[in-house]
Every structure is written in C-alpha cells, then in structure tokens.
C-alpha cells in the first residue's frame, strides 16, 4: 500500500478508534496515531487491515476545529488530499481543508460512507437489518396493534372492549363486567395499546391495598408492564430524588388509602401529569349529593387533572342507580350533573333496546316499526338500509347489523359504560360442590372449650374468626410447633383424596401461609406427594417457579397449596379440582378462591371439595354459603349485600356454632333475599348495553384474526436470527419452551430484558398461559422490540459486500442493493405509524440503473450470495468506488417516485380515516351527549398535525450491499 505521512486511514477491525493519521513509515511497517483515543497501532505495510479515507464531492466533512464544509473539489498532491468547498456556518466558498486537519472523531453513519471507509458488516447482519425494517413496518400496519402481545386467552368480549377504548383519545370509561369476566385484563389491554402507540406515557393505578400486588403481578406477567409500587416508604425515598416523588416513575400503583391519607401527597399525585388513571373497585367510593366520602373526593380531584380515566366497578344493577350515577359523574361531570335527569334519560332508552332486539331476532319489520327506526336514527340517508334490512336478499343481515350499530351509537351511556354478564358470554364451566363432613377431634374440642373460657371478653367477631380455624386455637395453647396435622381428619382425608386421584392437578387453598407450608411437609413426608407452595412470603420469581412446576404435565407437582393472599391474581384453569381446606370469612373471598379455576377457557367442570369439621364455624359457614347464597355452584352477585344485612346474626352463629336455634330461618331468609335480588338484577339488565359490550360477530372475528397472527412463523425465524446475531444462547427444552442466556460475545454488554440467569420463553400462547415462568414472545414483546431498536437505531448491517457465483453474467459485473427508508418525524402520541411507519424500499441496480428488485426476491437472492472477508471487501470497494458512486446517483434519481407514491397513499389514508371518524362523532354529537367536546377537538388537532407531518415526510438510504459477480 502507498503510505505517506499525514494521510488519514481508518482501522477495519477497530472502527471505534476514529480517524487515524500516518505518523511513521519504514520498509515493512506503518504506524498510525488515532488522536481521538491517543492510541498508536503498528501494521505490516503489505497486509494492513486499514482503509484510506477519501471523501468525494457532495460529502459533508468536519474540521478538527468543529466547523463543517460541503466538498466541491478534491485535489491530491504528494499523496495527500486537500478538500475545497463551502463552509456551512459562514457560507464562505473556496475554503481549503487539508486532510491532516480533519476531525479525528469522525463517525461514518451513512451506509455509503461506512462502505467506502472499509466498515463492512457481515452479510447476515445486512439481511437481518432488512428483515427488521420489513417486519417492523408490517407490524405497525397490522390491525389490532397492541392487542396481540399480552399473555391472555383470546376472549372476544375482552378484545372488543379493549379495541374500542384503546384507540380513543384520553378514554374515560366505566368497565363494569360481572365478576370473572376479566375487567383487570380489559384495563391492561387498554393500557398496553395506549402505551405502545404513544397515546399515553404516564399511568397511575389506584387499588385497594390488598390488591396492589395482584395488579403488579398481572401487569408484569400478562402485559410486560413494569409498575412501581408506591407506599409510605417508597414515597419518602423518592422525595430525595425529586420535588414531586411521583415524577421519578412513569408507571405507578398505589392504594386508595395511601392517596387520600395526606393532603400533600394527593396534591403531588394531581400535579404529576398522568395520561391515564385506573381505579379498581370503584364501587367502594361512597357518594351522595350532600355528603361524598373523602375517598370519592380524592378520586374526583384526580379525575379532574388526568385526561384518561378507567373505572373498574361492580355491575350497575349491583350498585344501584344513584351509586352508578356517581361513577359516571367522575368520568364527565359536565354531562352527568343532575341525578333526576339521568334517571329520566335511562327510562327513555327502553324503546331503543326493544328496537335492537327486534332487528336481531331477524323477523320482518312492520311499517310502524320501520318508521320508528327511522325516527330513532334521525338521518335522511338510511331508507336504503331499512329496505335492505327488511328484504330477503343476502344483504339483509349486514344491513340489520349496521342499523344495530347506529342505534347503539345513540344509546345513552354505551360510549362510557361497558358491561358483560355471564349470561351473555359463552365458555364458562359448571361448578359442582362436594362437602365432606368430618368429626371434630377431642384435642380441638378441649382447645375450643379453654379458649371460650379465657376469651370470654373477646368480641363476637374475633371469636367467630378464631372458630373458623381450630388448628390455630390449638396452637395458641400448645405452641406454634404443635403437630395438629397428626390428628386433624381433614389432613387424612386430603391425603386419601390425592393418592386416589394421582392423575389430577389439585389446587388446595387455605387462609394462612403457615397452614400451606405445614401441609406441604406432611404430604411430602408421609405420601411422597409432589406439592408446590404458593404464599405471600414468596417473591414473584419464587411464585412463578412454583406455578410453573404445578403446570408441568408429567413431572410437575400434583398439588399447589395456596394461601388466601398468595393466590390473588393467579389463575390455574388447566386444573379443575379444588380443595378448600378451610373457608374464607366473606362471600367475596369465596368467589375469589373459586375464580382461580372458574375462568373463561376452563375446559372441564370444576369440582369443589370442602372438608369441614362438624360443630365448628366451618359447618355453619358451609351451610350459609351453599344453602343461603348458592355461592359454591354459581357466582353470587348478591353475596356482599346479604352478608352486610345479616352480618351481626351470622357472626353470632359463627362465634357459637353449638347454638343453632333460628339458624335454619336465617338460611331460609337469606335464600329468599338472594332469589329476590337476583330476579331484580335480571330484570334490570340493560340488554342493549350487553350487545354493545359483547361485540358479537365483530368481536369473534377480531379474536380469530389475532389467532391467525399467532401462527406467524416469520416471527420465530426472525427471533432466532436476531438472538444469534445479538449473541444470545438458545437452549431448546422441548414442549415449545426455549431458555435464553447471555453469551460471552454479546453485541451489547447488557441487553434489556435478558437477565444474567437467562429467561424462559415460548412462542405458543397456550404454553404461556399454562406456564407463568415462560415469557410469551410476540412482535410486541419488549425483547423483540428492544432487539429491533438495537439493530435499527445503530448502523448494524448497514453496509456489506457479497459475491454472486453466476456464470451467466460476466466476471466483475456489479450490482448494488439499496434499502431506502421512507419516514416522517412526529411526536409519538400522533401515532403516525398507523399511516406511514418507517417503510423500506428495496432497489437492486446494475451499472445502467436498471432496477431488478421486482424480478429478484430478497430471500431467494440472499441464499445465492457468498460472504466476503473484510480485507478482501475493502480491496473490492477501493477498486470499484467510482462505479458505486455512479450507481448511487442513479438510485437517488429513482427513489423519489417510489417514496412519493408511499407518502401520497399515507396522506390519503390518514385524511380519509381521521376525517371520517371526526364526521361520525360530530354527527353523533347531535343525538348522543356522551361524546365529549375535548375528544372532537383532539381528533381535529390530531388530523391537522398528522397531515402536516406527512407533508414533511422524506427518505434516506438505510443500508446497501455491493454485489460482485464471480465464476469461482
């Protein structure tokens, strides 16, 4: 190589050293100084891995003083280059800059600059970059973005609600599904969509204290959302880091009690600029026109400051009209300001519901009914629809559906309230109760007698709680290590049941963690039964491992022993047998226990086994739950109401289970009350609202569409390719399970989402639902999104060289594969990617500028190519540099037409969709006051900003591959 002192070269193997300068040359070696790092390198002259840095007219270069110039002419004298051009800061022309004064921190970011500087990537990285661009663009355009990545079953009514609400600007809605239908999942889906699209960035979730960890686990496990739990301690710590402690985290969970207890804390919450507020158990917020509770006022204050609000609550029928109005008032106080007016409005919706029922029945409509529909919808252009709906044509069904949609759009609260019932949702199992009456051991009888004497001054409530758990009374006198399990007949029954049902997975729930731990030891030591334990003292990771062991079919645990609190938020619908070793104190907790198995998607009827001790509070409670409330075999929406109404009587019977006089009457009264309330709830059902919330055929089609996307084999192939190139080890464990661990040669030292110990993943939704330790990998998973970002935000794979062995072409024939990206810059919340995500345009040009991309598909072509080592590649580039420059100019001339077509199509789509949505809502505003002015304003503003951003869209070269034909 001809070296001259002062020339600038770059290392092919250590490009991070920057621009080097030749400082010494002898017959056999050359020394380069790299000023940006202060390091020297000694190379052999004959075979040095360095590339001469030579810029061309049109390039922008930087001097060591920091100013830039546009190169117009290059002169060479005695082996040294001088660049002549115009300074960009002063616009002075004819400025000369000798190469020795070039900035040494030079970074080659443009693909062509990297290629000419010898920074040649491996061929597989170029292919990965193109695939990443292609798949990333496709995913942004996919319908239902944000709904595919969560670890949940594809349940139509949940997807319907999430799809509707998740796309809105600052949604303010009430989610009031019946228990077990997945309000938490619906809220998580909405959050996931809003965060993924950029519509929201900061989220606050307020829940009862007992549900904080459940929400934390659900958001992380199902949606990969890492929330921070704020309590007094965390709040105090964060005060050292920021004036407003809540500014230290983007996603926060706290309890309602924590929020309302301190005036300053509530002020900090209100000032924290949240985008979305989620309130669980909102029906516990007590309100009346004269005296709203402090809790209600705290949420009301927050709801005034936060644009988006999701309230999760019991069904409107359970709440009562006034309480239901109070929730709606939090969402839109301007719309819901007068309770009497609200009651009157609700009565007026009955004809609308009747009209919808009439359309769905499919019967021919009379002229009077057609006229009534016309008046309700109140639009001039629906006559053809009405005629089609009443005809025998194939269009009749779709016309009826369209009319139903129009009616539902006009339904009073259908935009702010979503409510599904078990009656309206298919897929729930039956529940069968098996009670096992067992004798009360003498040891317990003695302990209870002594406890009664010593605890005479205890309240009835405390005595009732004690009597539910006789083993704890026994341990109070005999010590914590007393071996109650040696004589408790429930333990003997449990061991017998498990040994005779070895093939069944059994969930055992008890009130306390200590009971679960003691039972595990007994089962293991006496019968060798594999039992996992699950309680609140375990970390989330430990609970995951226990749940995963229980989920394993062949070698897993037969039994999972759960404490009351430890099992919150976890579902095990792959099991259908449940044992309640003891009973919870109230019907809500009973339903929560059964709800661990009684979920949509449960394939078998649920067998509920309740071994109970006679003459104890357990025997009282099992009768009251079953005979009084029918709470074991059916969900019990009346449970809390009746529990509150008979609380004192029930407590007395539990505290003194021997005194049974009048107990049969109590059960009879409770059953009558239960039946009456149930009938009242059924009568009050808003069937129109149910149809709207359920989504019908549209929701079913949505679920099926996402299920089809689950089978995308491109994702698996791409992910494996991505992991290989990043340097992530993959260990296939079978059963659709793969363990990923970091290797010693990672592309980056710390890859987000991959811990030192590694992670377990699956691409199969069913496996992910059964095994909570396995992360469900989709295009929306952070691991894939971080991988895409790692590849596309840097220059990985942006320049490479390949050889094409093809005897049909002359040796030395050049082809240049160009990957352009058409894109527009805009704030994330505009969700511009719906219309124009960064979109790759591939061109394959010969030296005459002929574009062969349409005839030569990428993957097929890629398989025909062979890699070139960096040294040989640099030599090839230097030899054909001028030809490549010429082809690049031909490419620049051609890309504009393709890019303009993409941009114009995006503009048309955006204008059409956003204008149509605005027009629809403006038209509905006249007949449905639940459409907020701020929502209309936001859509119009969004449309204008989107169109302006698309007007500014452009394109750039993202990657290139030089291909040289060879016959060898």
Swiss-Prot record:
SMART domains: DEXDc, HELICc. The keyword Transcription regulation applies. Pfam families: Helicase_C (PF00271), RapA_C (PF12137), SNF2-rel_dom (PF00176), Tudor_1_RapA (PF18339), Tudor_RapA (PF18337). GO terms for molecular function: ATP binding; DNA binding; helicase activity; hydrolase activity, acting on acid anhydrides. It comes from the Bacteria. Keywords: Activator, ATP-binding, DNA-binding, Helicase, Hydrolase, Nucleotide-binding, Transcription, Transcription regulation. Residues 164-334 form the Helicase ATP-binding domain. Residues 490-662 form the Helicase C-terminal domain. ATP binds at residues 177-184. Interacts with the RNAP. Has a higher affinity for the core RNAP than for the holoenzyme. Its ATPase activity is stimulated by binding to RNAP. Belongs to the SNF2/RAD54 helicase family. RapA subfamily. Transcription regulator that activates transcription by stimulating RNA polymerase (RNAP) recycling in case of stress conditions such as supercoiled DNA or high salt concentrations. Probably acts by releasing the RNAP, when it is trapped or immobilized on tightly supercoiled DNA. Does not activate transcription on linear DNA. Probably not involved in DNA repair. This is RNA polymerase-associated protein RapA. It comes from Escherichia coli O81 (strain ED1a). The gene is rapA.
């Amino acid at each position: 190589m001809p070296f001259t002192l002062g020339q600038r070269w770059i290392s092919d193997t250590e490009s991070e050293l920057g621009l080097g300068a030749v400082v010494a040359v002898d017959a056999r070696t050359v020394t380069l100084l790299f000023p940006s790092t202060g390091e020297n390198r000694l190379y052999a002259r004959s075979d040095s891995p360095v590339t001469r840095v030579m810029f061309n007219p049109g390039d922008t270069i930087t001097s060591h003083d920091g100013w830039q110039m546009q190169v117009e002419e290059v002169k060479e004298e005695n082996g040294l280059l001088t660049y002549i051009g115009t300074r960009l800061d002063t616009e002075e022309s004819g400025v000369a800059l000798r190469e020795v004064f070039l900035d040494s921190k030079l970074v080659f970011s443009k693909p062509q600059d990297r290629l000419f500087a010898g920074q040649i990537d491996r061929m597989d990285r170029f292919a990965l970059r193109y695939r990443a661009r292609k798949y990333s663009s496709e995913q942004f355009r996919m319908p239902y973005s944000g709904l595919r990545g969560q670890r949940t079953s594809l349940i139509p009514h949940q997807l319907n609600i999430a799809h509707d609400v998740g796309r809105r600007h600052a949604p303010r809605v009430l989610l009031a599904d019946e228990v077990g239908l997945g309000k938490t999942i619906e809220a998580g889906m909405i959050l996931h969509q809003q965060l993924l699209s950029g519509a929201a960035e900061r989220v606050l979730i307020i829940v009862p204290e007992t549900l904080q960890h459940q929400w934390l686990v659900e958001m992380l496990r199902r949606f990969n959302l890492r929330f921070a739990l704020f309590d007094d301690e965390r709040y105090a710590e964060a005060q050292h880091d920021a004036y407003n402690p809540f500014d230290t985290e983007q996603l926060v969970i706290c309890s309602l009690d924590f929020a309302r207890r301190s005036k300053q804390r509530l002020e900090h919450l209100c000032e924290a600029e949240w985008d979305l507020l989620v309130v669980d158990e909102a029906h516990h917020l007590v309100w009346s026109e004269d005296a709203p509770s402090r809790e209600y006022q705290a949420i009301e204050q927050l709801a005034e400051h936060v644009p988006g609000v999701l309230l999760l609550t019991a069904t409107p029928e359970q709440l009562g009209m006034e309480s239901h109005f109070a929730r709606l008032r939090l969402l839109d106080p301007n719309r819901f300001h007068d309770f009497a007016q609200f009651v009157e409005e609700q009565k007026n919706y009955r004809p609308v519901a009747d009209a919808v029922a009439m359309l769905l029945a499919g019967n021919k409509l009379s002229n009077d009914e057609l006229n009534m529909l016309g008046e309700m919808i109140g639009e001039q252009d629906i006559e053809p629809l009405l005629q089609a709906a009443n005809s025998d044509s194939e269009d009749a069904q779709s016309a009826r559906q369209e009319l139903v949609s129009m009616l539902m759009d006009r339904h009073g609260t259908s935009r702010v309230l979503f409510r599904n019932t078990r009656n309206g949702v298919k897929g729930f199992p039956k529940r069968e109760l098996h009670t096992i009456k067992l004798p009360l051991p003498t040891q317990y009888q003695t302990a209870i007698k002594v406890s009664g004497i010593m605890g005479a001054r205890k309240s009835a409530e405390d005595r009732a709680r004690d009597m539910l758990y006789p083993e704890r009374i026994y341990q109070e006198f005999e010590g914590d290590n007393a071996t109650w399990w040696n004589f408790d007949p429930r333990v003997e029954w449990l061991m017998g049941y498990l040994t005779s049902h070895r093939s069944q997975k059994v969930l055992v729930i008890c009130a306390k963690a200590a009971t679960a731990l003691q039972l595990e030891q007994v089962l293991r030591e006496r019968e060798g039964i594999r039992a996992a334990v699950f309680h609140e003292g375990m970390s989330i990771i430990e609970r995951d491992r226990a749940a995963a062991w229980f989920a394993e079919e062949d070698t897993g645990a037969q039994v999972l022993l759960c404490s009351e609190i430890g099992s919150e938020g976890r579902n095990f619908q792959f099991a259908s047998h449940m044992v309640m070793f003891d009973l919870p104190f109230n019907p809500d907790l009973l339903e929560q226990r059964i709800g661990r198995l009684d979920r949509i998607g449960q394939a078998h009827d649920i067998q509920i086994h309740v071994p109970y001790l006679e003459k104890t509070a357990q025997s009282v409670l099992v009768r009251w739950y079953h005979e009084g409330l029918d709470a074991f075999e059916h969900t019990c929406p009346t449970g809390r109401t009746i529990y509150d109404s008979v609380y004192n009587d029930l407590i007395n019977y539990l505290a003194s289970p021997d005194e049974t006089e009048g107990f049969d009457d109590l059960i009879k009264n409770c059953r009558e009350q239960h039946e009456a309330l149930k009938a009242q709830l059924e009568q009050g059902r808003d069937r129109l609202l149910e149809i709207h919330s359920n989504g019908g055929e549209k929701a079913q089609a949505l679920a099926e569409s996402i299920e089809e996307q689950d089978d995308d084999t491109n994702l698996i192939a791409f992910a494996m390719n991505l992991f290989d190139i990043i340097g992530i080890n993959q260990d296939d464990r079978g059963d659709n399970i793969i363990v990923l661990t970091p290797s010693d040669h990672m592309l980056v030292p710390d890859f987000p989402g991959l811990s030192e110990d590694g992670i377990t993943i699956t691409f199969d939704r069913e496996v992910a639902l059964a095994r909570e330790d396995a992360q469900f990998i989709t295009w929306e998973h952070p691991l894939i999104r971080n991988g895409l970002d790692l590849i596309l935000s840097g220059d990985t794979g942006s320049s490479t060289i390949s050889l094409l062995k093809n005897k049909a072409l002359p040796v030395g024939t050049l082809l240049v594969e160009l990957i352009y990206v058409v894109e527009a810059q805009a704030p994330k919340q505009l969700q511009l990617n719906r219309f124009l995500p960064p979109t790759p345009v591939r061109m394959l040009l010969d030296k005459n500028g002929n574009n062969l991309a349409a005839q030569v598909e990428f993957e097929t072509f890629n398989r025909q190519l062979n890699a070139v080592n960096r040294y040989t590649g640099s030599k090839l580039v230097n030899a054909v540099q001028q030809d490549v420059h010429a082809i690049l100019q031909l490419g620049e001339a051609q890309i504009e037409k393709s890019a303009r077509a993409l941009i114009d199509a995006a503009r048309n789509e955006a204008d059409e969709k956003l204008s149509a949505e605005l027009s629809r809502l403006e038209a509905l505003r006249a007949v449905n006051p639940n459409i907020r002015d701020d929502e209309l304003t936001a859509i119009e503003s969004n449309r204008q900003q989107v169109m302006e951003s698309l007007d500014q869209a452009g394109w750039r070269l993202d990657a290139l591959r030089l291909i040289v034909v060879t016959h060898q």
